[in-house]
Amino acid sequence: MSGLKRLISGITACSLLFSVTGTGVLQYDTSYAAEAKYNYAEALQKSLYFYEAQQAGPLPEWNRVSWRGDSTMSDDVTGGWYDAGDHVKFNLPMAYSASMLAWGLYQYSDGIKSAGQYDIYRNNLEFVLDYLVECDRGSEVVYQIGDGEQDHKWWGPVELVELEMGKRPSYTCDASCVTAEMSAALAAGAAALKDSDKASEYKKCAEHYFDIAWKTKSDDSYSKAKGFYDSWSGFWDELFWASNWLYIATGDKDYLKKAKECIPNLGKEDQSDELKYSWGMCWDDVMQGAMLLYAINTGDKEYKEHVAKHLDYWSKTEGVNGKCVQRAPGGLAWLDSWGSLRYATTAGFLAAVASDTIFSGDKAKVKQYKEFYETQINYALGDNPDKRSYVVGFGNNPPEHPHHRTSHGAWDDMKNDGVKDHRHVLY
């Protein structure tokens, strides 16, 4: 696989849930610029920078965001990432993002190293995994810190949140969706960082969280995130996802047996008994990524065919049985109006991994999937009808007003200062 392909895949892994963002004068490898339409190393660098803008608690020395400071220091668990442009710490989407960052490093470490981003990538991954470990409460986990309703009533930088609201509440549960997602993130991290001193700790905690999730097999206690990050897909997809990553991290075949037990309970196509293949992978529904891992882990023909069906639905104009994902002008694979680039770039990442693993010997599929993932990431970087970048701070005419309280920098809940333009660039 070419270095350029590895690098594009690494970018895709970083841009799944949050905006692709950052700021400052930073160093990145420019050697790919000559062979690529865009500077993918810069895009990767700015993708990673966003996670540093999201850091909660005491900031590490390596944090490069000059306009950020320590924040929410009285949280019951400090650290982790704030959600999107807000200040709540929701562990379901946070752990999903961590698991995908880990997969990117696990699968494409050479490309990340070639871009000059390996050390900072690793730092960002360990930062969030350390937080997930600290959320352990024995038979439960801390799954959320902050109240979404209260958070949305105030607009200002996160460094001032405690002055406005005081100590924030934390919430615990044993719900399978979030404990399994946290398990998957830690197991994927252990696999990606297998030479790290922290790998054994991540693996041990991943197994512990999985035991909670498997024993509970319910989302009843997952309540405070409703209305913000509901578990619409249920919990079987997260159990399937976590069991596959635990098999990779531990080599214990019992996790493959558990993965197989999950399959009959996974989502189906509407009015059908066929396993769902048309929906995209996201923070709520990790079935398609888990199915790809299962096909890699087992080599089972049936599940390789499922992966092909999913990717054909997304990447071929004729789709599957005459049906395919919608195409926006310019070639974007359009699934939903909320976070359309998120779905498209994630599908592109799965296409890249599949072409490098279970379909590496199929030249036609490798060509098809390569064209697909390049089209999707390049659309985000500027190959679209508006000829603009959708990455803040990157390329031509990027967005200038992202929904982000801290980068906006209003000082008094927009009562008097009336800041029109963002005080800080959220690359």
Residue locations for each model-derived region?
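Short coil/linker segments at helix-helix boundaries
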Residues: 106-123, 127, 166-170, 188-204
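Bacterial N-terminal signal peptides that target proteins for export
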Residues: 1-11
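Short, surface-exposed loop/turn segments at secondary-structure junctions
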Residues: 37-38, 84, 110-122, 196-200, ...
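Hydrophobic core
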Residues: 12-20
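Aromatic (Trp/Tyr) and acidic
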Residues: 34-104, 144-192, 236-261, 285-319, ...
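Carboxylate/His-rich catalytic cores and anion/metal-binding grooves
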Residues: 124-138
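Solenoid-like repeat scaffolds
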Residues: 264-269
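Sec-dependent signal peptide cleavage junction
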Residues: 20-35
